[in-house]
């Protein structure tokens, strides 16, 4: 079983029945399934659910570098400096780490698209807060090759045979070792600030794969 849900805000990504508004009670799915990773209670969008533990581990393990894509709306205009800083790695002192470099693209005056290959706790919200931004809406629109598309909020669908075949190809050589909560990327001692990080950028305004090589310092992953 592998299904794609458009999770509404307010639903908690846990199989714990004791948790109020948990996703399992919300779905009332006839068979036992559990979520592939998490999506913040306040966030919405694509959530995969399955009964296959190997798929969960291969998708979620950070070292496998699988992509997850989000559309984010913030409380003030998105600047070039903000985009460059987000793309180049953000030190999150409270988690003792610096985020990996990622791809970011402006999609509106107060909106941007971001593609991550890791899933730190409330990562995008923390990254935005570092630069003095507040997330107003966060929607996950893609996990690897599976897209949210026009699936209505609160509805789910079966992953198609074609999607599942492609997914299996993408995870064929991925580690299936269980994700360990204590596993952390490289630590950072830098304190938060409300200014952009300079360096080798992986994004400009409208071309998500273009690179700016004029930076003067290289950020760590």
Regions inferred by a protein language model and the residue ranges of each:
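Basic, flexible Lys/Arg- and Gly-enriched helix-loop patches that mediate nucleic-acid binding at interfaces
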Residues: 1-221
């Amino acid at each position: 079983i592998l299904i794609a849900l458009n999770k509404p805000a307010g639903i908690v990504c846990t199989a714990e029945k004791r948790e109020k508004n948990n996703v399992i009670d919300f779905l009332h799915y006839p068979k036992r399934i559990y979520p592939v990773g998490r999506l913040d209670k306040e966030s919405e969008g694509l959530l995969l659910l399955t009964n296959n533990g190997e798929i969960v581990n291969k998708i979620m393990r950070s070292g496998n570098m699988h992509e997850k894509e989000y559309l984010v709306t913030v409380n003030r205009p998105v600047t070039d400096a903000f985009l460059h800083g987000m793309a180049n790695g953000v030190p999150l002192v409270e988690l003792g780490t610096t985020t990996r470099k990622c791809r970011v693209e402006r999609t509106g005056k107060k909106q941007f698209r971001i593609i991550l290959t890791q899933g730190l706790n409330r990562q995008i919200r923390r990254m935005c807060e570092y630069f003095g931004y507040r997330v107003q809406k966060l929607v996950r629109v893609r996990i690897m090759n599976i897209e949210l598309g026009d699936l209505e909020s609160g509805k789910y669908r079966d992953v198609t045979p074609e999607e599942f075949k492609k997914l299996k190809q993408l995870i064929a050589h991925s580690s299936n070792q269980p994700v360990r909560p204590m596993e952390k990327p490289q630590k950072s001692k830098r304190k938060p600030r409300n200014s952009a990080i300079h360096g080798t950028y992986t994004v400009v305004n409208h071309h998500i794969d273009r690179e700016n090589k004029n930076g003067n310092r290289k950020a760590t992953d």
